[in-house]
């Protein structure tokens, strides 16, 4: 006989229990979440405001960056990262060997330490008309993690002291005057710095997992994560989620971020609450990692772009505040999934992550496969934004996989959840 126990965990620090410190929560619409349309986003982008810096959003935020005045780079912005990161291959292609390079090990979302280099020289770069000089950069194999189209990442050093608007729907970033006030409809969320370095922010988020378990937690703001809400394995142990959840899907990544392999357990949360807004039936995950960032106990998990994409976002990096306003895509939940995480390569898409028991898995797709076409389309015909939309569409996939020197065609339906 199953005994039901109502366990409500309140883990939020008293200083950030609510959003009342700098704003007032706005009532949200009671409309049911809507599903994404096939092979499309919900709405089309509008013209950019004056001074805006264009970005491409496809799980990550992609920017055109100019390094040392002459070297154009395609970079991802990541609040979970402090300084600039440069891909090893890009570094060798564009910069002379440096006597200031030193070997190092770094820790990220993966289960292990990652070998890298630390360059102690000054690095100048610009995003739009905004210039920054950082003392030092980390050089590592980012393309293994993010794909051949990524040259590097920039992070919190660029944002230090700035107030910045991020618009996921219209695709831009706008550096605001420090005294600028967000428009009507925004709600301020008082955040806290994770430590005295004031380089990583944690914000309060509530999650009702089901009728038995709820959590008011402190989540690291990680705009380098494409996920919505990820619970650390330390929280999973405290909540005893393994005993509570039944409909859980295991997803394993060969390269799940800096630090190598990663295992996530995917499930649907009844409700996620942030800044007074409720997102229903959201796909979230908890980590199975025993080491690395996702096993930390100084915060409860990650808030990624999969949650933030429902809002217009203004971050005051000087005051450690985040202002949120539901955008035109608010509540539009993704109902279909390919079951795979694909890393773009020059000659195809590498199957880096795969959900066990998914339709793709049961049809014969394996981690490490290289897909050379999807429904007759090659990588040259599908950019990152289109690939994201295709992955969440209802449309069946027919993929060609290059395996053991020969091509194999596999067709499967998307998983619906």
Regions found by a protein language model. Give the residues of each.
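Bacterial Sec-dependent N-terminal signal peptides
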Residues: 1-37
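Pepsin/retropepsin-fold aspartyl endopeptidases
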Residues: 22-417
């Amino acid at each position: 006989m199953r005994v039901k126990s109502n366990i409500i965990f309140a883990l939020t620090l008293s200083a950030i229990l609510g959003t009342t410190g700098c704003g007032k929560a706005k009532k949200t619409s009671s409309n049911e979440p809507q599903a994404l349309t096939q092979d499309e986003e919900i709405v089309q982008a509008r013209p950019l405001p004056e001074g805006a810096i264009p970005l491409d959003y496809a799980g990550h935020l992609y920017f055109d960056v100019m390094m040392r005045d002459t070297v154009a780079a395609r970079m991802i912005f990541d609040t979970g990262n402090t300084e600039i990161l440069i891909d090893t291959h890009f570094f060798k292609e564009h910069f002379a060997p440096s006597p200031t390079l030193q070997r190092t090990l770094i820790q990220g979302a993966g289960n292990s330490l990652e070998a890298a280099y630390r360059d102690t020289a000054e690095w100048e770069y610009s995003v739009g008309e905004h210039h920054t000089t950082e003392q030092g950069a980390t050089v590592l194999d980012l393309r293994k993690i993010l794909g051949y189209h990524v040259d590097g990442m920039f992070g919190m050093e660029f944002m230090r002291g700035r107030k910045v608007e991020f618009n996921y729907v219209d695709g831009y970033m706008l550096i605001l005057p420090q005294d600028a006030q967000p428009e009507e409809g925004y709600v301020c969320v008082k955040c806290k710095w994770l430590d005295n370095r004031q380089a990583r922010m944690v914000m309060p988020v509530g999650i009702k997992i089901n009728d038995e378990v709820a959590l008011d937690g402190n989540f690291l703001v990680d705009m380098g994560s494409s996920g919505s809400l990820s619970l650390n394995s330390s929280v999973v142990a405290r909540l005893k989620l393994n005993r509570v959840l039944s409909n859980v899907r295991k997803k394993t990544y060969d390269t799940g971020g800096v630090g190598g392999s990663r295992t996530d357990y995917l499930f649907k949360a009844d409700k996620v609450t942030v800044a007074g807004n409720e997102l229903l039936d959201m796909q979230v995950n908890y980590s199975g990692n025993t080491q690395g960032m996702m096993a930390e106990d100084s915060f409860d998990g990650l808030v990624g772009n999969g949650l933030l994409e429902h809002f217009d976002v203004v971050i005051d990096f000087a005051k450690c505040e985040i202002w949120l306003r539901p955008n035109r895509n608010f509540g539009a939940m993704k109902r279909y999934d390919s079951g795979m995480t694909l890393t773009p390569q020059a000659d195809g898409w590498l199957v880096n992550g795969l959900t066990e028991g998914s339709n793709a898995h049961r049809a014969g797709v394996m981690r490490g496969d290289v897909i050379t076409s999807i429904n007759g389309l090659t990588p040259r015909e599908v950019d990152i934004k289109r690939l994201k939309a295709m992955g969440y569409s209802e449309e069946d996939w027919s993929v060609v996989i290059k395996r053991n020197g020969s091509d194999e065609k596999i067709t499967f339906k998307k998983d619906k959840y």
